[in-house]
């Protein structure tokens, strides 16, 4: 299923239908509709213990507020607003490279230009405990691309058996222009979107067929044995991302790092020619 974003103001119903299918078909509202339609049908309350945290991986982050972020994650979580009953750290993981991830990549710090993070957007107190590494020390899976600078954007939530409840890959970065925001204006509640984006939403229920076979979407980890009905989803990072360690520094293209990359640079804007004799 396609998840588009298109600039505009979209009306929000004063009293949404029981299954919320009268919400706008753009941004995070489209994902919310899909989850409610296919994964948690109307008036059913899923057991929150059966689902892992929401994982968000992106290559840029906007100037988001904690209020917007909570609205965003409650829309994308299978648990809905009940996800906010727990701490944010338990509810969501943000995959964002460390300085070491970028510095040790094949391009070094200059490659971090494709992950343009501004410190004013990254160093917000409510976000800091949520960051997880791009690289992984827990697996030697050949599809992991820890030596390559990420530009992909992925969002998903796992079931308790490590299969995907749903998965989205697209162009949406973590920002209000890309995903949209609710606005209470002179014409009532509207949903404002400022950017053109496109994503693909997948869940096992979308693979149903006339034989009513059951399907699972599972990550490729190099060890999993295929079962009938398994649909493999390749991820270039570990599907259980690791939180930053005590000494990990988050990546920002505005920062200089003490450890040089393989080219002798210390930052994304270092000029290689200036390092030559």
Regions found by a protein language model. Give the residues of each.
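PLD/PLD-like phosphodiesterase catalytic module centered on the HKD motif
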Residues: 1-277
